[in-house]
Each structure stands twice: as C-alpha cells, then as structure tokens.
Amino acid sequence: MIIKNIKSIPSPNLNYIHISFCPNNEYTNLAYVSISSILSSKSLNTFICFYLIIPSDFDKKNKNFLDSLYEEYEYFNITFITMDKRYNNSYTDHRITEQAYYRFSLGELLPNVNKCIYLDTDIIVYKDLYNFFNLNFNGRMILGYPSYGNQNRQKYGFHRINTGILLLNLFEMRRNHFEKQVMKIIKKGRKFQYHDQTLLNDYFKKYLGIFPPEYHARPWSNYTEMKIFNNIIGKPFDSDYFYFSHKYPTIRHFLGNYKPRNFNINYIEDWWFYARKSKYYNSKSTTFQSAFSF
C-alpha cells in the first residue's frame, strides 16, 4: 500500500469498510464524484479502503486525478489493481464493456479481504456505509436489490437483483470457487441480455439475497414496486418506511438512462453538488465532460 499522507495510514481505532469500483478511462470522472460523496458522508471514525480494478490501458492522468482526492479528504486509501485479460472474451456491446465482469473476480483479487461493497460509478452516497457493510448475509453470498425492469417483471417476477450495488461475501466466493464458475459460463459464449446482471441471476440465484431499499434508491419510485418488494421479504407493507428510504437513502443509483448528463431527472442536483465540491471542477472545462457522455 502506498501511503499518500499521514491520515491515509490505517489505525486500529477506526471502523474499516472495503469498497470496490471497476472504472475504465471513460468513467473516471463518475468514479471521482462517487468516491467524493462517500468520503464526504462517512463518519470521522470510519476508514475507507478503496480498490479500483482497472484495465491495462487505464491512463496515468486518470490515476493522478483520482489520487488528487488525498488533497481534499482523509482517513482512506486507494489501491489500483490492474486486471489481466481473463475477461477479454466476455460478451460486451457498445454500452457495456468487459469491466462489468470484473466484480466477479473480487474474491481472488482481494485475497485478504473477507467482504466488500461493490459499486457502479453512477451512484452517490449520503450517509456512512458502516451499517450497510455490516449487514447480515443470512446464509447468502451476494446481496443486492431487486431489479424492476418491465421485462424482468414479465419473465422472471421480482426475484432478480440489480448488480450496480452489491454486498459481497468474498470469503464465501473464494470457498465456492465463484470466479471459476463464472469463467466456465463465459467460455460457453452465451450472449447475456443484461450482461453481468443476466449471468449472475441466471446461474447463481441460490447465492443471492436482498438488502433494504435505503441502500439502492433510484431517481424514481412507485407504490407497486415497493409493495412487491415487501412481498418478496414477507413483511407487511409500510409506505412511510419506503417513502423515507427513497427520500433519504444511504445510496442513490442513477441507473439506466438516468445519468448526470440529464438535468431533468429527480435528485440529479445531488450528484452535481459533489461534482462541484472538487477544486478541479469548472463548468467550462473538460474535467467533468465524460459524465455527460456516459
């Protein structure tokens, strides 16, 4: 581990949280804003260990840009891990790159870490993640939030999870040789409709559990989806609880077409609040332009 400043040195008196992102060059600015929101929202006694799994062509200037977070925040460190070519033959398209599959290798890439939060780069965090990090897996290996797409509703019901925010039991992933299982599936050459998300839900359903809605709020919500979530977990519907979880979540995910380039979606100003906090932010510069092309 490279020590960037004295307050990036771990201490036994702090609560540790392990978080991974898998950005490429195009998504660096989104990752910067996501990490900034995490560091702005964490408690003083929380130390964040970030693991950025990057492709071999990740630009040095993008590493330096992310390292500039040390100038603004404290009690965290960032470890860059360059991925090899193991996912070169995974199914991709113009929108989804092979980095989408990197999360499946976190158990092997982080051999000394037993659990980890995985986050897509299109999220912001409002609160300390300690409670999320310490959720009970209840015998499951991967926790996520139900995927509510219309096609999922019609074909699968609601027992599928979105892979943009995951809590991973890396110890169990290693014990179950999860990465090897994934690689065998990828080698078969199947074209997954929703890429990593289809792969995980189609082949590993027995490993999957769900976490509360406060850890995966979206820019929109509706009564039907909330009620079906309660049907899944077998508890009475509580509209006040869901309203609070959506209005005041721990994590918000700008998934699908609801991205920072779209100023007409709910809560997008929250994202730009963290973007503007950076001393590198300039609305007329190219520093944050890639956020619009995502």
Feature map (PLM): residue ranges:
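A glycosyltransferase accessory/donor-loop signature
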Residues: 1-17, 21-23, 33, 170-294
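Histidine-anchored nucleotide/phosphate-binding helix
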Residues: 28-43
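Short internal beta-strands
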Residues: 48-56, 144
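Short loop->beta transition adjacent to catalytic acidic/histidine clusters or analogous donor-positioning motifs
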Residues: 42-51, 78
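Short aromatic/hydrophobic "clamp" motif used to bind/position activated sugar donors
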Residues: 116
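Conserved donor-nucleotide/metal-binding helix-loop-beta segment in metal-dependent transferases, i.e.
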Residues: 123-156
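Active-site-proximal specificity loops/subdomain of glycosyltransferases
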Residues: 62, 70-108
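Catalytic metal- and UDP-sugar-binding loop of GT-A-like glycosyltransferases, i.e.
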Residues: 119
